């Protein structure tokens, strides 16, 4: 059995099963597609579940993959042992109703003994205790000796997860020798020691379970196998754990070079090295698959891993961002199998670096506060951090609760997690209430039920509709009617009003009868599909059961439609200019503008903004038809339609297409041709959160209004400057700037002269204390700039000097303290001295040892404060 590297083993496995008629599929993304039960792909079978369940047709009945996987339930244990890791690759061969047990068993044995040349006497096999068929195949057809076979129970050798396909499994173990074992006479396969390593699991999916203990033999049986690539590499390379296999070890060596440490020399250092090595592998692949750091979902998992790795870097002396450098090695070691990493290298590095920088700012403050909390707890003999303290660290300072728990645990301290969770929930409740209050809605929740079919929405094709009032609510209570002047919520059986959703605001308009008018301010809808029209009765009354005419504000709707279509064009343009990592992170579409939040790691340059804007306007000028279709979700995905992460979609979805330039799932209202947008203009680009940017833009008449506003501003500026034309503004502003610069230079020179003149006077009455000249002076009318200039001169003096200079103007005053180098060597500290002097007046201040400033409290006490300087200075300076 010869040594073989990770990349070689991966390729040998996939090639072997290709030779057996399997289709090699590339690894699926770590982000589950269409599976809301998973945060991240955690097994080789997970992305193929749709084929096993008959929800989709596989490209072949035989498939082989090497799947990227992330598992994080034991994240705190990663590093503490060499067994645990969050990232791994799972080799697998799968059959969807094609071959079954004998083929799976035969090929597994052939791959191990013929391709990898593993010694047969080192291999042991387990089967489910009642699976005589598999036992006989292994012993009678493959020839495995019975003393190398073991029958295990349901817990070990029967794969089942609730109801659905299930079945027995067979596992292949490698015997690493008695020197790796526990030394017990009865040590055997299944023992918890390190001698027998489970390498490959073959699952024979042959039953359909109802989840209640009843099993039916399936007509079409499946094979699902899984073998950890890193674990296989451990066996083939003769090493003890994944951190010692070639590709992982090379990553760790990079970390060692940065930290200037060596693995296997110090236990604490080894823990840190394992944490960093594992986590940077996970995060590199996660970012490569489109995960962005955030405070929720998989984005939080990514952020937690990065911050945990950065923290352990600090524990081994790495103070500056460094993980982004290690990304290079992770990609280098995996590029042959995952070439997309090389293409995204610059992007991945940047995301990691930015997150490290952000964490560095957070962690310094958080560590100081947490250290203070832990010190106080020890002094008080307590071992639990209060929920309030943990919440303050998390909410106010952004210090993660899991990091608080981990650091506390290292000192034998726990966190009151229940109280912390309660405070988090209280905050969420307040936020929800604030939102409801701001919405001005009497509809606080969905507790009020409407006993009628859901509202039929006709607004995609009509702006007005004849309808019937099916419910009226006032202050959250159902009523029969509302009268003039009352605010209410009106529910109709059918409506042209678009209900707020997908970031698009709800429609406004009028609901009326010949005798009454209800002005609709906005529209939303309940989870069960009833449209809620919020507004006020302007005239007459609105009564349940009566027929009404519902008409939207058509002009407002048209403006909103322009901005919504613009948001789609904007996302497509951003992906073209910045890259495919751009995804919608939120949006607000109104009649006045569109606000689009998207994933990106840095501010856009002026040139990038210009390119994005030009692309959108180019598509507007091309007059591309905007087509909306309702399609089965599978067909929509085949078209490449972009979905919003976290949004729930049914079997039939609405797809909005702008030619082949933009294809998105969307339930909003849009123009039928891009030409109707007129013009597109970006107003601003800013940061919303780490890794999320925001663009605000306008279209159509909004652009014209913007241009008119610009022209008005320029005309006003020209008039103020007494210019005949706005064309002269730029030149005139440049001239003014030059004049201001010259005046600043003259003021600086004048301040220097004033400073020099005053300096000649203030030393006349200087006292000497312990060999240090102590100077105080009241210099009323002197600006803070001149005071600072004088202080700079004093601190640069060669002789030992302490000076406090004061200036009072009306009810305000300033103090400047300066200490020369020679005075500081004798114990003087400007920041501490000025604090003492200012305190006499009721003021506050401070600063560095050489210079400091303070504000005066009571100006009439400045003289008294200056008189106290001699005594204060004497407390600081000492005789030689």
State where each predicted segment sits.
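A glycine- and charged-residue-rich anion-binding loop/surface
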Residues: 1-880
